[in-house]
């Protein structure tokens, strides 16, 4: 019962989206709407993921400690011997990367922004406290639903401010304490230079005479306000003018005038009414206009007694001293008393607490057990994997959970286990750090398919795999120049083989800037790409039509082979079939030609390197771990078997390719030079043309029989 009772001042979780993390808010008010619903007026807290990366870097810089140390014992205590150094919190250094990652999820940023949310969206309580340097950082991780903050975030201005003042430590900020005087020792300092006397307690006047003089001073102040046009507008009545003349500013000036005239009342009255007219003394209450007073009340309602923020955002033309002085005078007015009574009456009529039952509705991101089917690859399930097991958890990489939740973009089909989903909703991140944040253990290899692709739990094999979003890298001229000038730093071949390794672009840019003056003496020749206009290309295609490709001339050997029975030489494709309709590698990589004919070509297994492989029936190969069936109908060169057409889906991804090298291909590989091998690897779509000198040697003829005598067979 108490856990579901929410009061003003509680820190709570709010859910605004079924897939996003909870919002963290502090309840300021509970209001009942006209239709009977309860709305909560809350203060917003922001996570690290909600603000920009530049402000995150600023917050991390603020978290460093400024350690002041001296050059050594006995050194000068002045500013020369004091050195400031920014170091990382030593406690953060000792924490492992996983705890550092989780500690960042506990950091929040306070804001002055208020918003109203339905109370039915509350999903639980949490605790938020100001960061305490005396507490251990691990203590925040040991407590459940516990957060801390140290900076204030302004979502409109996109700025960060410190929420508390800082105590300045050092000789420049601390007072020098003199030694204690001994018994009977006199102070050698001149006291007249250290203090100023403004009132003499033992003066010749009695209290009655002083009170009468103060009454005269009030009367002079009232008369001066009657003569002043601006004051007559602000205090239109005599009663208000007399009240303004009776404030402390008038009395302090009268007593100061009496002290300066050596407590001679007649001289003091003459000083109050000089030749030009009576003296008018105004305080902050009279100096401020009505519009400025309204701005101050609005700022006080939003920021409270944070006078620095009030000055910066509402009254920048006023000094901080003036604002503080006006505040304490404003508290003595009738308007302040009336507002205080009105707020107290409103607080009595408002709700103090509200009961919100537990939210038991199913989350739309839940993955139902009926939709999880056993993953089938090439007609067989993954060995050692239980039916229903799919992709592992993106956070902890577990494959066992009583409930799964879809997470991330829908096309990625990522999911989280129940424990990591609760952590994601509360803390706005994953338990384990990613490779961008630090070390992260690799995925569970038991959850991989035979081709190394994670098996997805989807009802239809058409959506078993999704392609990643493509990108286009547009390089500038300076980037292309830097590739040549800083080749030993950039190491382009190494970077191409390891695209996931980061490149220090700042160091390369600095080195390129330093080498540019020397390189200007021998300028680099960049290849200029001249693109012809579209009209010129169309005219060329009209004048040079492509001739039709002639049919290949069949040789006598091919004619004889077409008449061979089907069982004589079955053609085996050594590439493993894919789960996407058993399509070959060439179909996925866009080789020119008719797709239907290409699927039926007997040399499709090695078409990329221009070699046709024919295997006799004597060699029994394995296909997907099973022996190839002997009763296989051979596909003749010009025949087209009834193949079920399947349209290629643009979101389907090709399967991995397994290339099995034979003795013949190894011999061909030895005939190629290293440059030709590398060129073929960089351009796998181009066929390899072997020169006649590189042709394979013919097999020697069979040896002649040893016995030359004829063999006679008698009946």
UniProtKB/Swiss-Prot annotation:
Q: Which stretch carries the motif SH3-binding?
A: 545-552, 696-705
Which tissues carry this protein? Answer: Widely expressed but not in skeletal muscle. Highly expressed in the brain, liver, kidney and cardiac muscle and in mammary tumors.
Which residue pairs form cystines in this protein?
A: none
Its keywords, alphabetically, are:
Acetylation, Activator, Biological rhythms, Cytoplasm, Cytoskeleton, DNA-binding, Isopeptide bond, Metal-binding, Nucleus, Phosphoprotein, Repressor, Transcription, Transcription regulation, Ubl conjugation, Zinc, Zinc-finger
Recorded hits in PANTHER family, A to Z, give: METASTASIS-ASSOCIATED PROTEIN AND MESODERM INDUCTION EARLY RESPONSE PROTEIN, METASTASIS-ASSOCIATED PROTEIN MTA1
**What's the stated role of this polypeptide?**
Transcriptional coregulator which can act as both a transcriptional corepressor and coactivator. Acts as a component of the histone deacetylase NuRD complex which participates in the remodeling of chromatin. In the NuRD complex, regulates transcription of its targets by modifying the acetylation status of the target chromatin and cofactor accessibility to the target DNA. In conjunction with other components of NuRD, acts as a transcriptional corepressor of BRCA1, ESR1, TFF1 and CDKN1A. Acts as a transcriptional coactivator of BCAS3, PAX5 and SUMO2, independent of the NuRD complex.
Any idea what this protein is called? Answer: Metastasis-associated protein MTA1
């Amino acid at each position: 019962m108490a856990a579901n009772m929410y009061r003003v001042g509680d820190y709570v979780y709010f859910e605004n989206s079924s897939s996003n993390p909870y919002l963290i808010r502090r309840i300021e008010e509970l209001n009942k709407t006209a239709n009977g619903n309860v709305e909560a007026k809350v203060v917003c807290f922001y996570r690290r993921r909600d603000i920009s990366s530049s402000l995150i870097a600023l917050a991390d810089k603020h978290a460093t400690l400024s350690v002041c140390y001296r050059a050594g014992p006995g050194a000068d205590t002045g500013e020369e011997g004091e050195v400031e150094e920014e170091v990382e919190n030593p406690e953060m250094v000792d924490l492992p990367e996983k705890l550092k990652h989780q500690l960042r999820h506990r950091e929040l940023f306070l804001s002055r922004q208020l918003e109203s949310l339905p109370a039915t969206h509350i999903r639980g309580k949490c605790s938020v406290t100001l960061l305490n340097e005396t507490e251990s950082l691990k203590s925040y991780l040991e407590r459940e639903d516990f957060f801390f903050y140290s900076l204030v975030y302004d979502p409109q201005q996109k700025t960060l401010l410190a929420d508390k003042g800082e105590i300045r430590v050092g000789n420049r900020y601390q007072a020098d304490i003199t030694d204690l005087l001994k018994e009977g020792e006199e102070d050698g300092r001149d006291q007249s230079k250290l203090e100023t006397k403004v009132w003499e307690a033992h003066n010749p006047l009695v209290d009655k005479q002083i009170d009468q003089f103060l009454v005269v001073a009030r009367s002079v102040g009232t008369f001066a306000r009657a003569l002043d046009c601006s004051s007559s507008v602000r205090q239109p009545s005599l009663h208000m003018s007399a009240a303004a003349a009776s404030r402390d500013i008038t009395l302090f000036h009268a007593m100061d005038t009496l002290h300066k005239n050596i407590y001679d009342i007649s001289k003091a009255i003459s000083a109050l009414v000089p030749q030009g007219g009576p003296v008018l003394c105004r305080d902050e209450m009279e100096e401020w206009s009505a519009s400025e007073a309204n701005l101050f009340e609005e700022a006080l309602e939003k920021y409270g007694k944070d006078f620095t923020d009030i000055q910066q955002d509402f009254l920048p033309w006023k000094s901080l001293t003036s604002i503080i002085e006006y505040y304490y005078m404003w508290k003595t007015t009738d308007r302040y008393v009336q507002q205080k009574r009105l707020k107290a009456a409103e607080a009595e009529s408002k709700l103090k607490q509200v009961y919100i039952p537990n939210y038991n509705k199913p989350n739309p991101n839940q993955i139902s057990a009926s939709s999880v089917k056993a993953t089938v690859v090439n007609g067989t399930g993954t060995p050692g994997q239980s039916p229903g097991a799919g992709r592992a958890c993106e956070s902890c990489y577990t494959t066992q959970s009583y409930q799964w939740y879809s997470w991330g973009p829908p096309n990625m089909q990522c999911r989280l286990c129940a424990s990591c989903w609760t952590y994601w909703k509360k803390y706005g991140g994953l338990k384990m750090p990613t490779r961008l944040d630090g070390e992260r253990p690799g995925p569970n290899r038991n959850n991989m398919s035979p081709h190394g692709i994670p098996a997805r739990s989807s009802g239809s094999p058409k959506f078993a795999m999704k392609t990643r979003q493509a990108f286009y890298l547009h390089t500038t001229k300076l980037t292309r120049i830097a590739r040549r000038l800083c080749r030993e730093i950039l190491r382009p071949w190494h970077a191409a083989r390891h695209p996931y390794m980061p490149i220090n672009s700042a160091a390369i840019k600095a080195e390129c800037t330093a080498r540019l003056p020397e390189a200007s003496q021998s300028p680099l020749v960049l290849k200029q790409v001249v693109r012809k206009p579209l009209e010129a290309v169309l005219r060329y295609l009209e004048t040079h039509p492509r001739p039709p490709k002639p049919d290949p001339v069949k040789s006598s050997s091919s004619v004889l082979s077409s008449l061979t029975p089907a069982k004589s030489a079955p053609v085996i494709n050594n590439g493993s079939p894919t789960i996407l309709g058993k399509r070959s590698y060439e179909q996925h990589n866009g080789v020119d030609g008719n797709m239907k004919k290409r699927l039926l070509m007997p040399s499709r297994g090695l078409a990329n390197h221009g070699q046709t492989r024919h295997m006799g029936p004597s060699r029994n190969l394995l296909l997907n771990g099973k022996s190839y069936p002997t009763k296989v109908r051979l596909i003749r060169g010009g025949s087209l078997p009834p193949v079920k057409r399947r349209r290629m889906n643009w979101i389907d991804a090709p399967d991995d390719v397994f290339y099995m090298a034979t003795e013949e291909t190894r011999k061909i590989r030895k005939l190629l030079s290293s440059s030709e091998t590398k060129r073929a690897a960089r351009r796998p779509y181009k066929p390899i043309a072997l020169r006649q000198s590189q042709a394979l040697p013919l097999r020697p003829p069979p040896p002649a029989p040893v016995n030359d005598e004829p063999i006679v067979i008698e009946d």
